[in-house]
């Protein structure tokens, strides 16, 4: 288990291409990076993490809802 920030980064590194935030969320859950019993608002956590990563310049939004590593 990891923080939402770490989970989003791990999924994007593994993907190696821009992917939609819902796919990021799904892959993070399937890989066990996020636990819905520990973080009940998984959707909110993923979206907050993406906003923070974009603000920090680590992730870019390529189109509506689609993100990639910077």
What are these regions (language model features)?
Residues 64-70:
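Short, cationic-aromatic polyanion-contact patches
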Residues 29-47:
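Short, positively charged loop/turn segments that connect secondary-structure elements
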Residues 1-20, 51:
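Positively charged, polyanion-binding regions of nucleic-acid-associated proteins
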Residues 1-2, 17-22, 39-43, 60:
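Alpha-helix N-cap/helix-initiation sites
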Residues 23-27:
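A short acidic, leucine-rich amphipathic alpha-helix
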Residues 54-62:
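A short, conserved structural fragment
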């Amino acid at each position: 288990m990891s923080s939402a920030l770490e989970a989003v980064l791990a999924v994007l590194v593994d993907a190696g291409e821009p992917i939609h935030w819902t796919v990021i969320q799904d892959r993070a859950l399937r890989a066990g990076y996020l636990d819905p019993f520990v973080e009940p608002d998984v959707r909110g956590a993923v979206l907050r993490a993406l906003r923070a990563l974009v603000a920090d310049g680590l992730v870019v939004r390529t189109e509506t809802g689609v993100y990639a590593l910077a």
